Amino acid sequence: FEYVGDRDTGAEASAAEAVKMGARGSSGREKVYYTRADLEKGVRLESPATGVSALIQAEGLNWLGLWKSFSDPAYALGVEPCNCPGLGRAAARERGLLPMLMPGETRESAVRAQFSSWRTMP
């Protein structure tokens, strides 16, 4: 990752923390990170607790939003490839991170997600 930011604090966070998948009940509240990454190469997320991994790749998108909630019973991960961090339009524009399309201009993007399991689920 080139950059990892915590949505709630606005502070930089470690890549290891952003991709860490905790066990069910390991966190009391959601965590949201926005990362700037080479999504053409992809980002792999792995959950030792469940034996599941995901490889997320994208073309034309340089940011990845990761929403994680490992509370019990809700155990969820949201993955959002995007063209800017989820700071809101005004904050992204102020930081020079909001892409703009000119009239008549087009852009294309593609997203691929590959999921695998390395152990048998009960």
Predicted regions and their residues:
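Active-site/ligand-binding surface loops and adjacent short beta/alpha elements
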Residues: 1-58
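Active-site pocket scaffolds in enzymes
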Residues: 44-122
